[in-house]
């Protein structure tokens, strides 16, 4: 069986049977006999935050789940068996919550994920006193519950989420909804790992850009003959983090004064570079570079228009996460002397 054992199948079937009875007769029971109300007895108010003005109108059924902590019947939601590539966001405020690559079939009839977008989901004690509720960190919308120790995936975590609490942005529409930035600062493994921890960063991918070779391979780039740099593509939620904050962070996790190298990694492929997608990004990068020069730094960072971004081989993606280690080559250094409100903490 893929990604889950017989125990999870049996558990999921048990959960569905009890759920069906509960929907007709009262409280719902899900996992280990825990019960929770379906009648809205514990309302969940919207939290005031920067996104309050973007709250979307809800249908009565969505309000029952999102505001009043209700639960949709199993196998009824539109996303329980949905595996199209893309991003799942909060139905109420639109904040990015989950990546499609972290979705799996838990056999329970609700969308299940084994990881969330950094900082996007908040855990809190459920009113039943036993389980852990998960809510959108942006607006407080009820999502569902999180379970650990079920051994369904290597991460050993399952976010059990109501479809009614979610919306979906397909891969083809990501650029219409979210921001995209591309940075190069030496070995892309460490830069990738650093950006993955930034709240508001939805997804990172490592690859090659800035050169002339079509569909380059890692050995070709390492030879220094392609003109490409090892780079990181950052997909980010502009409701949470700004491009300016990401660029500041970039300048603080590598040494922008080194030319065509970072530490022991030497060559054009390890250069410091920002690849801007539009004039707004270009202006932000130029402004930050001037601030650093005003502080006496001899900035060597290349500023180039973004061309084709060639994804690196699969074994380079999420390198340190797959190893279960933290990079030793990346250390943040304060370079700007201030920390504005939209800065990465």
Model-predicted segments: where are they?
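Generic early N-terminus positional signal peaking at residue ~5-7
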Residues: 5-6, 56
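Short polybasic linear motifs
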Residues: 7-9, 13-15
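C-terminal segment of classical bacterial N-terminal signal peptides
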Residues: 20-28
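Flexible coil/turn and secondary-structure edge motifs
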Residues: 30-345
């Amino acid at each position: 069986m893929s990604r889950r054992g017989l125990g999870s199948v049996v558990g999921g079937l048990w959960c569905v049977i009890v759920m069906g009875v509960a929907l007709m007769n009262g409280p719902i029971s899900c996992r280990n006999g825990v019960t929770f109300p379906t009648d809205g007895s514990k309302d969940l108010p919207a939290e005031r935050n920067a996104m309050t003005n973007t709250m979307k109108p809800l249908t009565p059924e969505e309000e029952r789940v999102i505001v009043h902590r209700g639960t949709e019947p199993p196998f009824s939601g539109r996303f329980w068996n949905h595996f199209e590539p893309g991003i799942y966001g909060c139905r109420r405020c639109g904040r990015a919550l989950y990546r499609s690559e972290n979705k799996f079939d838990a056999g329970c009839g609700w969308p299940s994920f084994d990881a969330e977008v950094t900082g996007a989901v908040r855990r809190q004690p459920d009113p039943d006193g036993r389980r852990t509720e998960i809510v959108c960190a942006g607006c407080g919308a009820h999502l569902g519950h999180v379970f650990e120790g079920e051994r369904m995936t290597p991460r050993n975590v399952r976010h059990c989420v109501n479809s009614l609490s979610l919306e979906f942005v397909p891969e083809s529409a990501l650029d219409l909804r979210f921001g995209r930035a591309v940075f190069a600062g030496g070995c892309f493994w460490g830069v990738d790992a650093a950006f993955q921890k930034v709240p508001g960063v939805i997804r990172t991918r490592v690859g090659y850009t800035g050169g002339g070779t079509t569909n380059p391979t890692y050995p070709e780039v390492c030879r220094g003959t392609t003109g490409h740099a090892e780079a990181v593509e950052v997909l980010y939620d502009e409701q949470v983090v700004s491009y300016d904050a990401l660029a500041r962070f970039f300048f603080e996790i590598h040494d922008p004064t080194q030319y065509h190298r970072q530490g022991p990694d030497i060559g054009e492929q390890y250069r410091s570079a920002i690849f801007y997608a539009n004039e707004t990004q270009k202006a932000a990068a130029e402004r930050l570079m001037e601030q650093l020069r005003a502080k006496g730094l001899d900035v060597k960072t290349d500023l180039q228009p973004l061309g084709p971004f060639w994804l690196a081989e699969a074994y380079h993606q999420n390198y340190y996460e797959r190893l279960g280690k933290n990079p030793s080559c990346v250390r943040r250094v304060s370079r700007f002397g201030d920390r504005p409100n939209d800065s990465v903490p």
